[in-house]
Amino acid sequence: MKGDQEVQVIVQQGKEPIPTDQDERSSVSGSQTKLSHSNTYKRWLRVAIYTFFVISGQSVATILGRLYYENGGNSKWLATVVQLVGFPILLPYHLLSVKTHTTTQRDGKLTSLRNRALVYIVLGLLVGAACYLYSIGLLYLPVSTLSLICASQLAFTAFFSYLLNSQKLTPIILNSLFLLTISSTLLAFNNEESDSKKVTKGEYVKGFVCTVGASAGFGLLLSLQQLAFRKVLKKQTFSEVINMIIYMSLVASCVSVVGLFASSEWKTLSSEMENYKLGKVSYVMNLVWTAVTWQVFSIGCTGLIFELSSLFSNAISALGLPVVPILAVIIFHDKMNGLKVISMILAIWGFVSYVYQQYLDETNLKKSNEIPTTESPDRPEAEGSSEQSK
């Protein structure tokens, strides 16, 4: 008996180190869970960086653009060019990504050069037109009014995302869009004059219409970018984001430069620099940093489209809404009357409504992802017990 017990103990000890299929599956699932958490943290870190780029780039670029007009600048086409011409700062990264991409091509389905070129040309023409309309609005409207009208861009993006990208319009999002629309509509009745430049009623209406048109153009642009990433480009890499910014900006810059020479505004640029109130150096530095900050905004905006959606990218752009009017009051002494305050409150309310909907979507997505992971450990046990019974 004692010998049999010793044999049983030895056999049991020999069996203990042997891992079962269930242990292997649980270890694999555990490593996959850690990997998914790590990827989630990295993703949201990128989202945070892109968000900072959008808010800071948009705010600084808008203030610099108005500073150009306030101190003697008058060229709408030049103001358009500097919004687009800063893309060469991205060329070093672009060349590096091209070298690494040529050695590691994975997909058998590479987008044809013709389709890719068509995407960049269409988006470039659209962004060039939208930037020109934005420059007209910046010339005739106070910065605080302009930024509040630009909040309507979120409503346009939601509409075009619904048509092009199957974006769901929940009651909360519809409430957000309604508030943003009312917020912009109120400013149509705000006949305000800038302190440094007297603006007629006709010029104010022209600036208002052009700003709304620019908001609609940018809303369509963001939705088309998301559609291009999903249907045409089909490659989930950050280098694709940089490529889109560079080629799209190249097309738009060429169109803007043609407009600058066709309108004969280039003839007045030398005298404009001579008579600039802050001096020649400040004139050049204003244009340079305006170009750089708009590219920072473009990187953040396109990156958010790549990581999440065009509607979320636009919502983050609207998050910087209170920043520009406050800076405009401090720097340019814009008047913050009651109508503007009401418009700002409605715009912030609309933005918060949209963020709440995003929170609900993320919560539901996490719950749906947790259901299969909690059920999966039971399956190996059931299979193991059925095999033992056999």
From Swiss-Prot:
GO terms for cellular component: membrane. Expressed in mesophyll cells. One of its GO terms (molecular function) is purine nucleobase transmembrane transporter activity. InterPro entries: PUP_plant. It holds the Pfam family PUNUT. It is a multi-pass membrane protein. Keywords: Membrane, Transmembrane, Transmembrane helix, Transport. It is found in: Membrane. The chain crosses the membrane at residues 44-64, 78-98, 118-138, 140-160, 169-189, 204-224, 241-261, 287-307, 312-332, 336-356. The keyword Membrane applies. It comes from the Eukaryota. Residues 12-34, 367-390 are annotated as: Disordered. Belongs to the purine permeases (TC 2.A.7.14) family. This is Purine permease 21.
